[in-house]
């Protein structure tokens, strides 16, 4: 619903309409939180009998996974922000219609999360991670070089990228939680924070990249993803993950 509603508001009232709507929603949510008494859920305090390793910020596996999360969502939001410009300039598709084209992206992300639940019962996390990185890197490169070729090809590429994005959060969260069982709340908070930074930076950076340089922009991202894939494939990562 959000892409369709956003495109409708944008087509009629431009960015002022969109941000005014978001402001109203934010005020309503604030009032709900302020006036409605939400009971606190207290979790039992677990006494740890073993020393907890909290040096996660220097842990190579954690840094690798967080960097991967950053890159995935950096790329995804770069595509989301670039897509309206691409559709308008290359395919002559207006803002109102382009919002409808965002709906399959949302669906693909949901499908990705459902696929992960099924895959996780049959395959281990590292195997799923390798396949996901490979697919995302390959289709990121294809998006960079084929985004102006055909709207059908573009739609297929974006759909597959969205599916990979749907798999990533649950997959990385599972791996991180298993590695840092006793402090998973803290490390997942860091992971999500970095992920959101990736979204913001990706959305901002693509805005200053001229259209002729888009292919090289996404090629650079692909190279970084390949480097992470190669690191994950070596035994050192496997041993550290199994620690």
How should each PLM-predicted stretch be described?
Residues 1-10, 84, 201-210:
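Small-residue (Gly/Pro/Ala) motifs that create kinks and tight helix-helix packing interfaces
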Residues 178-213:
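A late C-terminal transmembrane helix in Major Facilitator Superfamily
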Residues 10, 112-125, 210:
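Helix-to-loop junctions at the C-terminal end of transmembrane segments
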Residues 23-43, 229-235:
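C-terminal membrane-cytosol helix-exit motif in multi-pass small-molecule transporters
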Residues 1-34:
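Helix-loop-helix hairpin linking two adjacent transmembrane segments in secondary transporters
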Residues 126-172:
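C-terminal transmembrane helical hairpin of 12-TM major facilitator-type secondary transporters
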Residues 61-103:
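Extracytoplasmic gate region of multi-pass secondary transporters
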Residues 37-68:
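Juxtamembrane intracellular "pre-TM" segments in multi-pass secondary transporters
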